[in-house]
A protein has these predicted regions:
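Gram-negative (and chloroplast) outer-membrane scaffold detector with strong preference
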Residues: 59-133, 163, 192-195
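Short coil turns and loop connectors of transmembrane beta-barrels in diderm outer membranes
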Residues: 3, 19, 25-31, 66-68, ...
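Residues that define the transmembrane beta-barrel architecture of outer-membrane proteins
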Residues: 29-31, 50-56, 89-95, 111, ...
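Predominantly the C-terminal beta-signal and adjacent terminal strand-loop region
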Residues: 77-80, 154-195
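Bacterial N-terminal signal peptides that target proteins for export
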Residues: 1-8
Length: 195
């Protein structure tokens, strides 16, 4: 009888406490792999189709104290420039390393807001290295190494204990290329917590 009472009390405690257990989030040293994608230099519309671009990124986050984080990764950006009846692609392959400071979060760490800065370096190619166009015109801007940085604003919300939805906006400023220094990006992403 005594054994049955202990088992019933144990089962009741498990049922009562099961909804109150939460995973620990943003612990120092915790890492996450994130995939991001989005638009570059404006919103997509039919009349701006030839001027816009897109980006994809893969990076690793490492959390520090206070839910801030270090971010290291790579990104691919492609932007188009209209020319007569075609569009010329400008592609950038960049690596980045930066720090994102958590300035707002709720008590359970489900919703977090970050502001961050990153150093960036990479390579830019104009029309995939083809300088001569179909009509005989020549592109004067060639392929080049680019360097600079980015300022980012990011929002994270946990979907599960190991899956995070990201919303981001950033302004990139890169020198060395001949097609413009500033590019605004916005997009979404998913992060998968590894540790």
């Amino acid at each position: 009888m005594k054994r049955t009472v202990f088992i019933l009390i144990g089962m009741a405690l498990c049922l009562v406490l099961a909804g109150k257990v939460q995973a620990q989030r943003c612990l120092p040293g915790m890492k996450g792999l994130r995939l991001t994608a989005g638009m570059t230099d404006g919103f997509h519309s039919a009349n701006r189709r030839n001027e816009l671009g897109y980006h994809f990124g893969l990076s690793m986050d490492s959390y520090t104290k206070g839910c801030s984080k270090w971010v290291f990764g790579a990104e691919y950006l492609q932007k188009y420039h209209p020319y007569k009846d075609m569009r010329l692609p400008v592609s950038q392959f960049t690596a980045e390393g930066g720090y994102y400071y958590n300035f707002l979060s709720d008590a359970n760490k489900v919703f977090l807001c970050y502001v961050g800065g990153s150093a960036m370096a990479g390579y830019e190619t104009v029309n995939w290295g083809e300088s001569l166009l179909y009509d005989g015109a020549r592109i004067t801007d060639g392929d080049a190494f680019v360097y600079g940085g980015a300022v980012s604003l990011e929002i994270e919300t946990y979907l599960t204990n190991r899956t995070v939805l990201l919303l981001h906006a950033r302004e990139r400023c890169l020198w060395g290329g001949g097609t413009g220094n500033f590019h605004f990006q916005f997009g979404v992403g998913l992060k998968f917590i590894l540790d």
